[in-house]
Amino acid sequence: GEGDKLRAMAGPTIRFLGGGLSDEEVRGYYLRAKAFLFPGEEDFGITPVEAQSAGTPVLAFGRGGACETVLDGKTGLLFDEQTPESLEACIQKFETEGVAYPPQQIREHSRSFSEQRFEDELRDYCTRRYADWQRELEACSHHETAKEAEE
């Protein structure tokens, strides 16, 4: 099938991982990786954030969610086209440019996408909107009271 074709194309230095890995196993791969390649385009794409949470730089196609989650030149690199040549150029740049990607800096950036931050920001947003709504109701009720007093 297609998996066999891809394995043959990839050669002996590439290992394909099947499904069913535990979170710990996946994190172990992220921790040992030199970089995480993300050549796809997704609206968000959680795997680049997961890799960064392990301090691993991400080499990603520069469209979709990767543009928001990967800081080009700081937490990884973005490439412009979904072509083998563009990906290869990105890998070459990563290998040869000599830029350090401090794992702590990468991990810190990944925290900006944490579940806790999402919960905190959603709660703050809802609290603000509720307060705005209450002010609008008060303004309406004052307006109605003033109108009734005039009649």
Named regions from a protein language model:
Residues 24-26, 64-69:
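Short glycine/proline-enriched, acidic/aromatic patches that form the donor-sugar handling elements
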Residues 45-49, 66:
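Short glycine/serine-rich donor-binding loops of glycosyltransferases
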Residues 100-138:
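A charged, aromatic-enriched C-terminal amphipathic alpha-helix characteristic of glycosyltransferases
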